[in-house]
A protein has these predicted regions:
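Hydrophobic helical membrane-anchoring modules
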Residues: 80-172
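Acceptor/aglycone-binding surface of glycosyltransferases and processive sugar-polymer synthases
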Residues: 2-85, 112-122
Length: 172
């Protein structure tokens, strides 16, 4: 709704955020108005988006109410950002590569008599693939390309140990 615009723009103008997005889960009393299937789906998508984007403190990644600082938008690879349903999740990943500050803006969930055009069976594979791809890219960019640290070594050794343990457990 247009009346929410100032709440989304104010943190950007005040220098507290580069990007703001709506969060329909902020007020637990209002979450009750969300249809159960959407509640479950959004919770699952939120967890996948947290892992792939690196923004662990955000929720409701597919919320389309957003605002972005023009300076940050000018650095986004607009031609590489996913289209359609994965757009919001992919833009969060891209914002993380810019180390942008993203802030959740509480808002009410409003579902009148609208019917969702989203078909889970059609997009589930795209979402899983997109989140796995972005997760791997984020780990590589942040722990190997930009900043090699003890965590980088721990990731390598951890992956080797998990893989080795899985193979050993499978054989035995």
């Amino acid at each position: 709704p247009p009346e929410l615009m100032s709440r989304f723009v104010r943190p950007i103008l005040d220098g507290q955020a580069d990007y703001t997005k709506g969060n329909r889960f902020y007020d637990l009393a209002l979450v009750r108005s969300m249809p159960p299937i959407r509640l479950l789906g959004n919770a699952g998508l939120s967890f996948m988006s947290k892992a792939s984007s690196g923004y662990w403190d955000l929720f409701d990644p597919t919320n389309g109410y957003t605002a972005i600082h023009a300076r940050v938008a000018s650095h986004l690879p607009l031609d590489r950002i996913s289209k359609r349903y994965f757009f919001e999740s992919d833009i969060l990943f891209r914002l993380n590569t810019l180390r942008a500050v993203v802030v959740d803006i509480p808002m009410a969930a409003r579902y009148n008599d609208e019917v969702s055009n989203l078909r889970i069976s059609r997009i589930l594979g795209d979402f899983m693939t997109g989140h796995l791809r972005n997760f791997a890219k984020r780990l590589f960019y942040n722990y190997f390309l930009r900043d090699m640290s003890a965590a980088s070594l721990q990731l390598v050794f951890g992956a080797v140990l998990v893989l080795g343990g899985g193979v050993y457990g499978g054989v035995k």
